[in-house]
A protein has these predicted regions:
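PAPS-dependent sulfotransferase catalytic domain
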Residues: 67-223
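PAPS-dependent sulfotransferase catalytic core
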Residues: 1-122
Length: 223
């Protein structure tokens, strides 16, 4: 999922800075909030499908990484929609007329958050978050079998997040199967198809996708 744990890892551990960490933490929280509360978004409704405590666990994870929380703001937080920009204009007019507090301003989000974790700090707290979610699903009582928990593109990260009793099984689909299903089944059924339907373009796309997979070496990955 975009803006999930792995994107947060990349943003906080590669080229991190104050504004980057603020955006990263809030983008992560917004995505976790959508996954938790949006009942009619098919990958969402975690409140019912995973745990009513999921969003609280995500907030606790962010708090464990945050070293500064401030009422200040970056220009990134001022990139408002047209409607919010209009309200900001009204606030400035009201401020000059002493009707609203001085310097009142609308922001995309608040407060400003700063996190500059070490690799060890990030992985430790991310692992606690992941296992807290898995325990909400019953891991304390029985083993779990989860479909597509990790895609092959992220399997090289596995050792940083999971214990030695965790195994990943890679299902290597035949590209011909993917192309035929998309072109002759899903597309005629008016379903969104995220792959080219021209065979030459599809082959180029699929080859590039396969070649982009970072090599992994882990005895707990079965492929």
């Amino acid at each position: 999922c975009p803006n999930g744990v792995f994107d947060l890892e990349d943003k906080l551990l590669i080229g991190n800075n104050a504004i980057r960490s603020d955006e990263a933490l809030h983008s992560f929280l917004l995505t976790m909030k959508d996954l938790h509360f949006k009942r009619h978004w098919w990958p969402g409704n975690y409140a019912s499908n995973l745990s009513p405590h999921f969003y609280t666990l995500a907030c606790d994870f962010v708090k464990s990484l945050t070293i500064i929380e401030s009422d200040s703001y970056w220009y990134y937080q001022q990139n408002l929609s047209t409607l919010k920009s209009f309200f900001n204009l009204l606030l400035r007019v009201a401020s000059k007329a002493h009707i609203s507090p001085k310097n009142a301003i609308l922001l995309n989000y608040h407060p400003m958050l700063l996190a500059i974790p070490t690799h060890e700090e990030f992985y430790k707290n991310a692992k606690l978050f992941i296992y807290a979610c898995l325990n909400e699903m019953g891991l304390d009582d029985h083993s779990l079998l989860i479909d597509q928990l990790m895609l092959p593109h992220n399997l090289w990260r596995m050792g940083n997040y999971f214990n030695d009793d965790t195994y990943a099984i890679v299902v290597d689909r035949d590209p011909r199967d993917v192309f035929i299903l998309n072109k002759y089944y899903w597309h005629p059924a008016n379903q969104a198809v995220p792959f080219p339907l021209d065979v030459t373009s599809f082959c180029s796309y699929y080859r590039a996708m396969r070649e982009s997979v970072k090599p992994y070496a882990n005895n707990h990955i079965i492929d």
